[in-house]
């Protein structure tokens, strides 16, 4: 264990099979939290659990779990509360997005699917976890917007993704207002391009990586751990006076 910053806290982290969700689950457990995870891809979740066992980290998981299905979300929340008697931290890291230029985008299979996979999944988890956070006397919700909630993604057909992440940003500010009387804090992290299984293919597109690097003040691509460190702060009591805020973790891209 790296520290006891999250000791005694119960964290529910979605999308632990890869990327940011995996990074947050491992980081939280290393700092003392009990972690319940989930993923729609069972194999990825099992890989994360294997890593956790090697380090003797307290991570369990419910998988496969389709967060666009309200029944699956409720099952996840109930399993977490049954195992740990409550929820202190909710990290909505799982997301799915389809990329297409507007003239080619299908309304049902791409636009609506992306809003379900980036916005609905956050709403459903927050709604189901809400009464349990209230019962604990408050807690921390950590959602993920994006640099593309602020700026266009040049050279990429990211219209639905930008809309979904912009929605997460606005929704989280409203959640912060509604949660404040209950001691519930809600914040967003807006990552730049993070190297994950989902982004590696696009990084191979000729010229794309170079375009991204040209926008960065800090000349390296982000890693899941860069985001997990910020999430650890927001999950901890160190951030007890922080709510309705957005943290840009993007190598300086949106400051240029």
Stretch-by-stretch model annotation:
Residues 2-7, 232, 243-256:
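Short C-terminal tail/terminal secondary-structure segment
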Residues 4-36, 175:
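Canonical Rossmann dinucleotide-binding motif of NAD(H)/NADP(H)-dependent dehydrogenases/reductases
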Residues 31-47:
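Conserved glycine-rich Rossmann-like NAD(P)H-binding loop of the short-chain dehydrogenase/reductase
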Residues 74, 97-112, 135, 154-160, ...:
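Conserved mid-core segment of classical short-chain dehydrogenase/reductases
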Residues 78, 117-135, 176-177, 181, ...:
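Amphipathic alpha-helical dimer-interface segment in Rossmann-like NAD(P)H-dependent oxidoreductases
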Residues 96, 107-124, 138, 142, ...:
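Catalytic Tyr-X3-Lys loop
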Residues 180, 185, 242-244:
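Short, small/polar-rich loop/turn modules that mediate ligand/substrate recognition or access, typified
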């Amino acid at each position: 264990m790296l520290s006891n910053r999250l000791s005694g806290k119960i964290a529910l982290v979605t999308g632990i099979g890869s990327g940011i969700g995996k990074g947050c689950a491992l980081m939280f457990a290393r700092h003392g939290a009990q972690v319940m995870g989930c993923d729609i891809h069972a194999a990825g979740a099992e890989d994360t659990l294997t890593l956790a066992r090697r380090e003797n980290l307290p991570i369990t998981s419910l998988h496969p779990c389709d967060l666009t299905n309200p029944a699956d979300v409720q099952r996840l929340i109930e399993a977490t509360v049954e195992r740990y008697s409550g929820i202190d931290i909710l990290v909505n890291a799982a997301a799915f997005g389809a990329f297409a230029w507007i003239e080619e985008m299908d309304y049902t299979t791409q636009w609506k699917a992306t809003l379900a996979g980036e916005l609905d999944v956050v709403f459903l988890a927050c709604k189901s976890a809400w009464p349990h956070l209230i019962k604990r006397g408050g807690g921390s919700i950590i959602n993920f917007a994006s640099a593309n909630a602020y700026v266009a993604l040049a050279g990429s057909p990211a219209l639905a993704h930008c809309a979904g992440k912009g929605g997460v940003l606005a929704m989280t500010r409203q959640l912060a207002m509604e949660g404040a009387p209950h001691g519930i804090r809600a914040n967003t992290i807006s990552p730049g391009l993070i190297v994950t299984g989902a982004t590696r293919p696009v990084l191979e597109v000729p010229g794309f990586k170079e375009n991204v690097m040209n926008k960065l003040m800090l000349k390296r691509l982000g890693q899941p751990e860069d985001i997990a460190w910020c999430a650890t702060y927001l999950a901890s009591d160190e951030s007890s006076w922080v709510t309705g805020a957005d943290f840009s973790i993007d190598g300086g891209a949106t400051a240029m």
